[in-house]
Amino acid sequence: MQQQQQQQQQQQQQQQQQQQQQQQQQQQQQQQQQQQQQQQQQQQQQQQQQQQQQQQQQQQQQQQQQQQQQQQQQQQQQQQ
């Protein structure tokens, strides 16, 4: 009887060790996910800045076109 009881106790200890290992793996996975999220946020910010710059350039081009049109009108008046 005594021998059988000892064997059962050893098996239970082994099971506990396995559970601990699984918990450690889960923690590592969570850390990796957090890092990925941070990287994505940084990329989004950069993209927004680039878009703003492009919009400013377009506005400048439009202003230049308007100036050219005014010059053409003045020339026509002089010819008349």
Swiss-Prot record:
Listed transmembrane segments: none
Species of origin: Homo sapiens (Human)
Source taxon at top rank: Eukaryota
Span of the signal peptide: none
Tissue expression from the record: Specifically found in brains from SCA8 patients (at protein level).
Cell compartment(s), UniProt: Nucleus
Note: It is unknown whether this protein exists in non-SCA8 individuals.
Chief site of localization: nucleus
This protein's name: Ataxin-8
Keywords: Neurodegeneration, Nucleus, Spinocerebellar ataxia
Disease entry from the Swiss-Prot or TrEMBL record: Spinocerebellar ataxia 8: Spinocerebellar ataxia is a clinically and genetically heterogeneous group of cerebellar disorders. Patients show progressive incoordination of gait and often poor coordination of hands, speech and eye movements, due to degeneration of the cerebellum with variable involvement of the brainstem and spinal cord. SCA8 is an autosomal dominant cerebellar ataxia (ADCA). It is caused by expansion of a CAG repeat in ATXN8, which is translated into a nearly pure polyglutamine protein which forms 1C2-positive inclusions in Purkinje cells and other neurons.
GO cellular component: nucleus
